[in-house]
Amino acid sequence: MVSGLSWKDHEYMTSALAPEDVGWDWFGLQFYNGTALMLFQIRQADGSVTRFSSGTFVAGDGGVIPLESSDFRIKTTDRWTSDQSGATYPIAWEIEIERIGLTLRGAALMANQELRLSRTYWEGAVALEGRYQGMPISGRGYVEMTGYVQRLS
């Protein structure tokens, strides 16, 4: 018998980026205390992120808290450069959402999780730890990053 967890990803509207947008960073994170967090930021050519970046926090009781781009901060703390594509990807982050009392440190379980298909993406597993409302929190998740090799159109 085999058991475990899996992830099914169905993406809609990849081509919906504005002309000044180059790609996105998407985080799907599940914590051992029963909470979950989804965040995405759409990156622009000048290094900024759009106001359309957003997220959702799901509390342990199932309550949902929508997050706007102004509610969270994602800071890259380490990077990895692919020998294959030459792209440099973030592989460790600090995430802060002061509004809900959440601070996280996360890192890729392994640096090379680049997918070289018709578009080159970095998609991979991450581990996280931090504090939620003053209590320790940890979990696992999945991160998808696009537009580091070529702008998505």
Predicted regions mapped to residue ranges:
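Structured soluble/peripheral alpha/beta segments that form catalytic or ligand/cofactor-binding pockets
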Residues: 1-153
